[in-house]
Amino acid sequence: GEYLAENVRTQYLKLRGEKLNAADFDLFFKGLVWNQTDPVIEAWQAYYTLESAQAENNQSKIAAALLKAKVLYRDSKAVTDPALMKLGDRIAEADRTWLWTRVMILLQKNRMTETKRVLETLPRPELPAPMKELRSIIDEPTLWLRRQKNLGNLPARLAVFASVRIAHLRPADAARIAQAAVDPKANAFWRSLVWSRIGFPATTQLNPKASSWYAKAGSALQQSPLAVVDAQQLAAWHARALIRDGSWYGLSKVIDAMPAELKREEVWTYWRGRALASRGLKTDAQTAFTSIAHRTTFYGKLAADELGRSYGFSNPPKAMPRQVEIDKGAGNT
């Protein structure tokens, strides 16, 4: 009975979310036990929370609701679902300064149809170029790039837009744009975003320049975290590029700069230990390896190997077999 009721409430909120008011939505939402974190339902919940705060004209509630909604939109894997599209529209109505950030979020997510739809809603003076040119970058990026006689003439925002779009396809071409027009014209945050977005696909494609492109990003991504999609993924792939290069000092720096949650993952605990050991910091390396060497996981076993220890047991025996028992068992074979 509970499962059926939960399923009915969930489907009702998904189908009727846009037709409800804040009070009715909240009534059904509070009745959910397991599905409050469903992406579509979360989007409608954020939508109505913001709507209620605006109706009250409570500025602190509006600020809190906007922050929650922006984080949800940035992190969602379903930005083309109608619920997320409506949420994005409401955020944009409440905060006009977020308009261009929304475009760049969609571009990073490689959601080109939705990017074009949102671009059409922006006031023309806020666009970095005519819509025809922006559509050309989205739909025919290679052809658009061939038509550019001098990349250095591109305005900063247009260069950022084109770099992020083209990085998905050809990181080397995006790097050309970044060197010519992003580096000399854009601020530190946008330079950092562009080079991170170039470094990421370059690493997955095993491009030997990946780590050098990543290095150009610096640390300015932290200046506007709400505009960065999958920041932890970007950091992780930067580390992988350095592992591939055997750049141990650089790897230590990148891992040390990771968010605490990511840095605690055993994969990065292990590689931090490897980096420290390669730099001659044996005591620090052993501390890192020891923290995970008891685990039965892949990296736990690798850490045990580094320490010369036996692997951990998921269900350890009460006592190790004695030699006489081993010999007896061998005699029965």
Question: What kind of region is each of these model predictions?
Answer:
Residues G1-T333:
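Extracytoplasmic and endomembrane cell-envelope/extracellular-matrix remodeling and assembly machinery
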